Amino acid sequence: FVMTLDAVGPVPPISESHVEMDGAWALYETWVKFQMGLIDTALVYSYGKPSPGSLQDVLSTQLDPYYVAPLWPDAHAIAALQARHLLEKEEISFEDLADCAIRAGTIDSKEEYFDQPMFADPLRRADCPTYADGGVAMILAAEGKAEELCDRPAWITGIDHRIDSHHFGVRNLSAIPSAKKAALNAGLHQTDVDLAELHTSYTVQDILLRKELNLPLNPEKSSKNHPIKAETLMASGLLRI
């Protein structure tokens, strides 16, 4: 991280704040500093390089250290547990998963989808992410300063930050209350949504998040820049923004 800061080249030396998690969390912390009047410009950046190791296994170390992590369920297996739960409750179908995979661009047709063998039952390879190395950066500026930097700044009019527990025993795998609460606090339901960028690593998560946010499962237009096609740890969330 120090080498990254050197590469950015802040001269003269300025305040730098290092946070963990996705770059979207760094953006939220930056927004808070703007509200406090501590800064009027900021560079927010994040990057990830999962290629040297097995990311789906590394993520298992974040689970409950006593009851879950020693069993080494990888990220694919946990997503599969969630998918099986939703399928058996008949809240989603294999057709929904296939449609989402086509929308994400991991597969071209339903026939091709159903021809794939199970990868992490009941998920197929097209349901799961392909990990990629990458980075993202964006510049934030306060009102008054932003107009000096560009002719047409995009404004943050609502923002909220929430998280669900990672303990399986205290959460419902068929709901995302943190997302619903964050959407409410950010004012999502106060107006029509023209464009929605979702950071979802699996088709089952994409479907569930759309339901929680009351977004259509099959929108008229869909971006092929989907994180399932290229999931970059710590950068994919900020990239959506």
Per-segment meaning from a language model:
Residues 42-90:
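Flexible glycine-/small-residue-enriched beta->alpha junction loops
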Residues 63-77, 109-134:
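Short, charged N-terminal helix-start/capping segments
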Residues 53-54, 111, 207-208:
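Short glycine-/acidic-enriched loop or helix-start segments at secondary-structure transitions
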Residues 1-43, 47-50, 119-241:
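Claisen-condensing/thiolase-fold acyl-transfer catalytic domains that form or cleave C-C bonds
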Residues 104, 111-115, 143-149:
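Short alpha-helical interface patches
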Residues 73-113:
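N-terminal leader/propeptide and maturation segments of large enzyme subunits in energy/redox metabolism
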Residues 48, 103, 110-114, 199-202:
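Flexible, active-site-proximal loop/turn residues at the rims of small-molecule/cofactor binding pockets
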Residues 71-78, 89-92, 96, 127-132, ...:
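Short, contiguous, pocket-lining structural segments
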